[in-house]
Amino acid sequence: MANTPYPQSYYAASANAVPPRPVLQGEVETDVCVIGAGYTGLSSALFLLENGFRVTVLEAAKVGFGASGRNGGQIVNSYSRDIDVIERSVGPKQAQLLGEMAFEGGRIIRERVAKYQIQCDLKDGGVFAALNSKHMGHLESQKRLWERYGHTQLELLDERRIREVVACDNYVGGLLDMSGGHIHPLNLALGEAAAVESLGGTIYEQSVAVRIERGANPVVHTAQGKVRAKFIIVAGNAYLGNLVPELAAKSMPCGTQVITTAPLGDELAKTLLPQDYCVEDCNYLLDYYRLTRDKRLIFGGGVVYGARDPANIEAIIRPKMLKAFPQLKDVKIDYAWTGNFLLTLSRLPQVGRLGDNIYYSQGCSGHGVTYTHLAGKVLAEALRGQAERFDAFADLPHYPFPGGQLLRTPFAALGAWYYGLRDKLGF
């Protein structure tokens, strides 16, 4: 992946200026080698550096090249699986730990932004929008469940109230989370990378990890160098490839498509989202959108299984945008791109250890902006010998996709077709 540039996205076009970073050449020795300079890797590196570890980060392309620099930019707390489903699959102590941690990622982001003065257009407020009474009942139930874990900041919105925060007639109500919000995701990653370097960490770009030499003193090999470490953190997620085959077997890269309009102007933008909150609906195959600092609308949705890039992203997403906001029918689309996320069969993150010294976290299944920041803290705690929260994730049950890697894409696509049909029929 030598000299791999960022995709032609709005985020890349509006990224903060950063100095070039070196390619790994020769041999380096460190305490922890982190594979991947996305949110999981950068969050892990920051927590470790703050606790006295020497850290080297290997990035196959550029900081935030993958999902961390392409996502919708929404700070969505909790997990991709509802907490009541988690409660039924694990014991009460494990469920309690997972429930307590579910909103921590958003707090970590805000702490990082404040501590390191990261310029990433942070805004408070996120809305889950209900398209029908079943969705609304589900939001009411989830609010009650989250309150049991101490998350009392959630506010139900009736049909009148949701019209005050989003000018879309499709919604019957919603749930407002002021601990949610939105950011410029690539600039958040770039700011975190700068924080890593300010603490003495090293980041090598265009340095693909091609092989991990396991053992008591593991070594990560690249084309032009190698890193000897006491510990390794594997944080490649959907862009890891087959570097660790046992991780690839239980997950699948999937693509989501995003478009960005031309600037709308202050007046039109304010009519769409008067409070400047971000929004996602409650469908299984959901749509999500928000405004940018320069008053564009970013709108995303859809899933392409197997990480294939569709030929015409605008043709897929623009009709979804116009269904929500028909008044934008004459607005030009300036950017369109795909970003991959890593799906697990359970839709819960996979966290664990390979041997005694290789740690990993992957498979956010669409809730990566917040979860990855929590994961970095949990991984760092485990390396310091405090593994209770790590174990709460590591003990979650996970299963390979039926049919293995060959059949996982059609299997998942069939499931998505079923849930998409349910969305259309309002089930």
What is the predicted role of each segment?
Residues 1-32:
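Extreme N-terminal leader/targeting segments of oxidoreductases
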Residues 78-160:
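Dinucleotide-binding Rossmann-like beta1-alpha1 core, especially the glycine-rich loop
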Residues 137, 141-145, 170-230:
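Helical element adjacent to the flavin cofactor pocket in flavoenzyme catalytic cores
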Residues 50-70:
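Glycine-rich FAD pyrophosphate-binding loop
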Residues 307-309, 314-424:
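C-terminal catalytic lobe of FAD-dependent flavoproteins
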Residues 21, 118-128, 161-195, 199, ...:
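Helix-loop-beta segment of a Rossmann-like dinucleotide-binding subdomain
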Residues 107, 115-123, 209-211, 217, ...:
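Active-site substrate-recognition segment that forms the wall
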Residues 30-57:
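N-terminal Rossmann-like FAD-binding beta1-loop-alpha1 element of flavoenzymes
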